[in-house]
């Protein structure tokens, strides 16, 4: 980042008021009567009602539209383990996106815990304060155990966006890309470079969407994850296959799909040349992908390419998913975000990309036209229809799969965030 851009980022966060979020009042407070209702003695009445039935917290407090964004700061963006407090700007930023795109209030919680179990214990004890929990920037493999334990212990949705948000958007784009390439997920040969939280979640969700595990090769820093390796943790071991392939060059031969969640420049011209016709390449490392889009297209003009960057077509951006997934989950008071809800989000995103693009989106991107094809396989983050389509699909899937505590909302579909409260 240039000095000018660095200073602009610092100024944005510091001026005119430090931080990006604030608390606003939702009730009148102008008179003595207002204050008596807001606090003592009036506040005693909702206290009694919640003590009588904890579900009344959704009626008398902001719990139902409140998500906690929680981190230990062990894997902050691409910066690494910088500690809980340093993660606060990122957690506030996540809150901005929740509010901007789905009308969800949030609070950021940075936990200084000496172990994964200490983190789990801390969060579990206070989880009932919120309608949902978004885990963020927690390193692998600890993030898997933390999420699993909290899902089991909490009766509200717990969602590690670094895993599942990336997976949902990737799967949606992948289904569309393969369709354009004249291929199917069920028969596609997939190579995944990377075996961290996002990579493992992506491959698990692709399998849930129809990919065959025997057609999937995953690589970590030591090469292909195969059944002969004895250094695999339980999460990598799920993807160990019986093969004589050992390197990316071996694995990529004839592959239909490459998913990169690893590091910059790790895919070469020779690698992409070895892929099958109409190769699908998702090079998602930011800011520099596994292979630069210009180089990929120069080497393989038939490539269908996606990256994590906003300055190239087909950006894999988690903001396409998490605000609307939580919106749908909160509005039916789901106890968890399960596989059915994730798959529903995948198909909602996939289908939306096939519809005509609104004029407002074209103007925002200074385009005369955008339509479903090689350069448009995923919707754009500013498409207002995301709120309607993804939230509705997730809410319906929660109801259908039995994790909703309320019926499908009568005020759905949502057209804008102003419709959130019906």
UniProtKB/Swiss-Prot annotation:
Induction: Up-regulated by salt. NADP(+) binds at residues 195-198, 286, 318. CDD domains: NAD_bind_2_malic_enz. A divalent metal cation binds at residues 136-137, 162. It is an enzyme of class 1 (oxidoreductase). Its EC number is 1.1.1.40. The record marks 162 as: Important for activity. It comes from the Bacteria. Divalent metal cations. Prefers magnesium or manganese. The active site is at 39 (proton donor), 94 (proton acceptor). SMART domains: malic, Malic_M. GO terms for molecular function: malate dehydrogenase (decarboxylating) (NADP+) activity; metal ion binding; NAD binding; oxaloacetate decarboxylase activity. The record marks 236 as: Confers specificity for NADP. Its cofactor is Mg(2+); Mn(2+). InterPro entries: Aminoacid_DH-like_N_sf, Malate_Decarboxylase, Malic_enzyme_CS, Malic_N_dom, Malic_N_dom_sf, Malic_NAD-bd, Malic_NAD-bd_bact_type, Malic_OxRdtase. Belongs to the malic enzymes family. This is NADP-dependent malic enzyme. It comes from Halomonas elongata (strain ATCC 33173 / DSM 2581 / NBRC 15536 / NCIMB 2198 / 1H9). The lineage of its organism: Bacteria, Pseudomonadati, Pseudomonadota, Gammaproteobacteria, Oceanospirillales.
């Amino acid at each position: 980042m240039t000095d000018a851009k660095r200073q602009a980022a610092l100024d944005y966060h510091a001026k005119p008021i430090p931080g990006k979020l604030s608390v606003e009042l939702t009730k009148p407070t102008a008179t003595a009567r207002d204050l008596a209702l807001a606090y003592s003695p009036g506040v005693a009445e909702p206290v009694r009602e919640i003590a009588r039935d904890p579900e009344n917290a959704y009626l008398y407090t902001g719990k139902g539209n409140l998500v906690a964004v929680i981190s230990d700061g062990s894997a902050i963006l691409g910066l690494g383990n910088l500690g809980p407090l340093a993660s606060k700007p990122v957690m506030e930023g996540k809150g901005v996106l929740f509010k901007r795109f789905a009308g969800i209030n949030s609070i950021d919680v940075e936990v200084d815990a000496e172990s994964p179990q200490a983190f789990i214990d801390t969060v579990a004890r206070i989880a009932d304060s919120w309608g949902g929990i978004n885990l963020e920037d927690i390193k692998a493999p600890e993030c898997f155990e933390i999420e699993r334990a909290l899902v089991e212990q909490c009766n509200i949705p717990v969602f590690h966006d670094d895993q599942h948000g990336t997976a949902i958007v990737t799967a949606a784009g992948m289904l569309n890309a393969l369709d354009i390439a004249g291929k199917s997920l069920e028969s596609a040969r997939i190579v995944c470079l990377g075996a961290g939280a996002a990579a493992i979640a992506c491959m698990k969700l692709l399998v849930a969407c129809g990919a065959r595990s025997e057609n999937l090769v995953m690589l970590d820093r030591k090469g292909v994850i195969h059944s002969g390796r004895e250094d695999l943790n339980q999460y990598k071991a799920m993807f160990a296959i019986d093969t004589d392939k050992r390197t990316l060059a071996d694995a990529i031969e004839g592959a239909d799909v490459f998913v990169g969640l690893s590091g910059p420049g790790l895919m070469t011209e020779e690698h992409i040349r070895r892929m099958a016709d109409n190769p699908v390449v998702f090079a998602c490392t930011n800011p520099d992908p596994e292979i630069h889009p210009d180089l990929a297209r120069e080497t393989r003009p038939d490539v269908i390419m996606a990256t994590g960057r906003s300055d190239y077509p087909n950006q894999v951006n988690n903001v396409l998913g998490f605000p609307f997934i939580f919106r749908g989950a909160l509005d039916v008071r789901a106890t968890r975000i399960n596989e059915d809800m994730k798959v529903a989000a995948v198909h909602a995103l996939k289908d939306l990309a096939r519809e005509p693009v609104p004029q407002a989106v074209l103007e925002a991107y200074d385009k005369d036209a955008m339509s479903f094809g090689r350069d448009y396989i995923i919707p754009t983050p500013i498409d207002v229809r995301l709120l309607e389509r993804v939230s509705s699909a997730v809410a319906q899937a929660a109801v259908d799969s039995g994790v909703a505590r309320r019926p499908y909302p009568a005020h759905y579909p949502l057209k804008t965030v102003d419709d959130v409260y019906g």
